């Protein structure tokens, strides 16, 4: 099973990715994680990526493709994988198709988790984290016992700069601009499945499972 997972910030993509990987016994490949791994291990590809990052430049598709493909060549990906954070544009999507085709494979499905914009903003801006022990809270859905104080260590909670309204709106705009062409691309290929991400975590996961196990309607509500 070879799956790409799409979804805006705040859609619960990370949570669903872990559940999918466990359920179908396939590796969850997050591009952020493999980039960090290559940088940590000081690999040739890591060094190449770092040259661009140190200059404040975007890592070119060619380097990103190689980093992802290097990971997909590993033994644990032989029976499938779940890609999260890649592809991000049409050239990357075309390269992934070519890479898989050369090995006699193709994508099983592209899962697109959809959540209403206001709900996304609410989910993200409500997050609070403990800068000391790393515990996470949400002011509406999982607040601390004492307002703005960590239950575990008593430290004052903070809102990360990424979770502030202005930053969230910008991140969503970037995501929408980046992802719309991809959604069109995979829709034309007949492998995109839209999942209603406004439901509970378990309900969303059940819908994803249905899609991956053969209930391949364009949208699952």
From Swiss-Prot:
InterPro entries: Adenyl_kin_sub, Adenylat/UMP-CMP_kin, Adenylat_kinase_CS, Adenylate_kinase_lid-dom, P-loop_NTPase. Keywords: ATP-binding, Cytoplasm, Kinase, Metal-binding, Nucleotide biosynthesis, Nucleotide-binding, Transferase, Zinc. Residues 126-163 are annotated as: LID. GO terms for biological process: AMP salvage. GO terms for cellular component: cytoplasm. Coiled coil: none annotated. It is found in: Cytoplasm. Pathway: Purine metabolism; AMP biosynthesis via salvage pathway; AMP from ADP: step 1/1. Residues 30-59 are annotated as: NMP. It catalyses: AMP + ATP = 2 ADP. It is an enzyme of class 2 (transferase). CDD domains: ADK. One of its GO terms (molecular function) is ATP binding. Zn(2+) binds at residues 130, 133, 150, 153. The keyword Zinc applies. Belongs to the adenylate kinase family. Catalyzes the reversible transfer of the terminal phosphate group between ATP and AMP. Plays an important role in cellular energy homeostasis and in adenine nucleotide metabolism. This is Adenylate kinase.
